[in-house]
Curated annotation (Swiss-Prot):
This is Putative SWIB domain-containing protein 070L. SUPFAM superfamilies: SWIB/MDM2 domain. It comes from Invertebrate iridescent virus 3. Pfam families: SWIB. PANTHER family: SWI/SNF-RELATED MATRIX-ASSOCIATED ACTIN-DEPENDENT REGULATOR OF CHROMATIN SUBFAMILY D. Residues 1-21, 199-282 are annotated as: Disordered.
Amino acid sequence: MFQTTPKQVKPTTVPKTGRKNADVAHEHFTNGTQKLEEALLKFEAILKPKEKDQSIQEFRKQVRAVCKDAKDAKKFLEKYKNIRYRPKRTRESHNTGLEKPRMISEAMATFADWEYGKTEKSRYDVTKYLCAYIKDNDLRDASNKTIILPDAKLKKLLQVDDSVVLKYPTMQKYLKHCFDEVVARAPSPTTELGAAELTDDQTTAEEAPKEVKKSRKPKEVAVPQPPPEEEEVAPVEQQQQSVESEEEELQLPPPKPKKSTGKKDKENIPLEKVKKEHKIKK
């Protein structure tokens, strides 16, 4: 059985983004050019006339090897381009934060021999000067170099107590003593007038009653009503009985009998009854 040895690949070191690394870029460029030269030599060897016994398979192998070298050369040149010609980030403004220049204090001017009242320095410049002073005078702890051991001159400038452990990150808190306090400027008369006008406008706006927005009435939603109940039709006999009962209720009461009074009643008696009564009496 044939034993296949694994292919040994050289590790490629790629620099971090945003940093220049000319050595790595030069290495990628040389590797790319070497691969291109090898590919060209192989291609020229293929084009030269050889023995007639050369098979098609061997020809294909040679062409594949040339293509592989060309691809490797392309990869190396792309890496070189990404490292060498990466676009840089540029900031538009340098007048913010640590880079904004301010007037230094009198204590800082005497400490650094700068002219007081005219020189303006940023926090970055002052920090750089103090770090150089600490390094030159060997004011760092031997075991931990992040700890600063300030001398009397530096203590007076930063106004640090003996109990405080001063470090490079915490030093920024004490740099406020190296600059003059920013005094608020008095407002000009024009600005005062503008402010007065604004206040008058604000008061009038506050006094004016706010318009109450009419709220829209909610739309009346038609509630579905149940269908009317069908009246049950009574049979004919019940209808007749109900009609008779209604008629009885509507009938007038019978007339009262008249009281009999003397002659008038006799006059109204028929003659036949009078004759019969007369015969009976006889």
